[in-house]
A protein has these predicted regions:
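Extracytoplasmic
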Residues: 1-231
Length: 231
């Protein structure tokens, strides 16, 4: 076995990618059924069914029809699905998805977008899918921009891969906060023991001033993380 290490390559921004292509917009429509992927990363990502929405197709009043893919079966970082499609006219295309992201309550999830095996621009590394208990119809984007992709005539492969995206920064921040609080907790245990006396004043502010100060700082840091997620 061997491991090959490649240098990181900076991707161009979406603004750079789209520059000069605005006149290439097209009105062609290509329909892709989510339950018929070209390929998936593993056997756990497979078509499932939804009967809660009457416009999810195909539907049958008597039979269970496979008409969606994903849910909790497609949420592990690195899992992906691919779809093959064919373009007749060169131009800019929006990729509009009908989806329901009700797994991460109050938060968005992210997918990395590949076209023919390449991430076309930096922002495509973290396309966002906002939380809602209802189905949504939205073009791929990152909350600030709606992405358009330039495609030449012929067959193409669209790949959507689970990624932490910008939430990766949040996860690292929370991990650092938890690590600091655990260290503070161990310092407190040295003073109080595992069964502290609730009637005793341990004088934490006097005996452990650095610990008290750090707990305040970590509380503020955690509040900032919550504000970022909810904002």
């Amino acid at each position: 076995n061997e491991i090959t290490v490649f240098p990181y390559e900076d991707k161009i921004s979406y603004d750079e990618y789209i520059s000069g292509k605005q006149e290439a917009a097209t009105t062609d429509v290509i329909h892709i059924d989510a339950e018929t992927p070209y390929a998936t990363s593993d056997y756990t990502v497979y078509p499932i069914y939804d009967r809660k929405s009457s416009i999810t197709e195909p539907q049958d009043p008597a039979k269970i029809m496979l008409n969606t893919i994903g849910s909790e079966k497609w949420q592990t970082v690195g899992q992906w699905t691919e779809y093959e499609f064919e373009v007749q006219t060169a131009g800019l295309y929006e990729i509009v998805l009908r989806y329901r992201q009700n797994e991460q309550t109050g938060m968005y999830t992210s997918r990395k977008v590949y076209i023919d095996g390449e991430v076309p621009f930096e922002e495509a590394n973290y396309a966002k899918f906002n939380y809602d208990t209802n189905w949504q119809v939205e073009p791929l984007g990152n909350g600030a921009d709606t992405f358009q992709f330039y495609l030449e005539p012929g067959k193409h492969i669209l790949k959507l891969e689970v990624t932490l995206g910008e939430m990766g920064t949040v996860v690292r921040q929370v991990a650092q906060i938890v690590d600091s609080v655990n260290k503070d907790y161990l310092e407190i245990l040295k003073l109080t023991g595992p069964s502290p006396d609730k009637y005793r004043d341990y004088g934490f502010g006097r005996v452990l001033p650095d610990v008290v100060e750090d707990l305040v700082l970590q509380s503020m840091a955690l509040t900032n993380v919550v504000d970022y997620i909810e904002g």
